[in-house]
Amino acid sequence: MAVRKLAPNTPGTRFASYASFEEITKSEPEKSLLVPLKKSGGRNTNGRITSRHMGGGHKRFYRLIDFKRNKDNVPAKVAAIEYDPNRSARIALLHYVDGEKRYILAPKGLKVGDRIESGEKVDIRVGNTMPLKNIPLGTDVHNIEMKAGKGGQMARSAGSYAVLAAREGVHATLKLPSGEIRKVRVECRATIGVIGNSEHENISLGKAGRSRWLGIRPQTRGMAMNPVDHPMGGGEGKSKSGGGRKHPKSPWGQLAKGQKTRNKKKASTKLIVRGRKAK
């Protein structure tokens, strides 16, 4: 994928860049794999905002993605590479030999006509899925399960991958995109390869309107608010110490710069060998 820059004909196009979509082979999605997507506007079931800066945006359908890859030993042919408005990665439409159709995350290098498969012992080839116990050390993997059978949860965004670093007993050690080194059970599945569309991070929206199309609302700085609205509000001018402040905080008073917020009693903490911010 390449990034396409626009001519600076207007202020909105001066800094804007778009994906070239050159890898897309089909413009209309598979209707049997679509479900309506209702927008929440960042509200929970009580109507209260739980995720700020969300709302509006273009209407979308949700594409049902096969994160579990549990259709074992049934070969599938890649029928199309498609755009998915709900994620940064591209998706691939698979036609299985028994007639079933499924979407998967499209790894880099996957092309229309390729054949892929899932199972305990399948070929080490881009797009194939198998348990970590059968994947060679040093292999780049994505769509990794944290709990066997639950479906992939890690390394799913554009350009993401983890490296299978070691295996010892019932655990495999992975180096994740964040830099975190973490253990997971060897029965957990992962897909071979790197997620495609790696240039996504280089795209510049160029104007506020494109954020609104994506459902992202404006974000007001805490320092620009009043003390009643934010712990960092108040003070005269751009005061960093006025209003009784000492440290930057979230709107709910949690320290925002460097303070660890993970619960130390969480059971999976012992599986993290090295944190993502460790030096």
From Swiss-Prot:
GO-annotated cellular components: large ribosomal subunit
One GO MF term attached to the UniProt entry: structural constituent of ribosome
Pfam family, one: Ribosomal_L2_C
UniProt keywords, alphabetically: Ribonucleoprotein, Ribosomal protein, RNA-binding, rRNA-binding
Biological process annotations from GO: cytoplasmic translation
Function noted in UniProt: One of the primary rRNA binding proteins. Required for association of the 30S and 50S subunits to form the 70S ribosome, for tRNA binding and peptide bond formation. It has been suggested to have peptidyltransferase activity; this is somewhat controversial. Makes several contacts with the 16S rRNA in the 70S ribosome.
Assembly, per entry: Part of the 50S ribosomal subunit. Forms a bridge to the 30S subunit in the 70S ribosome.
Protein name, per record: Large ribosomal subunit protein uL2
Organism of origin: Chlorobaculum parvum (strain DSM 263 / NCIMB 8327)
Gene name, Swiss-Prot/TrEMBL: rplB
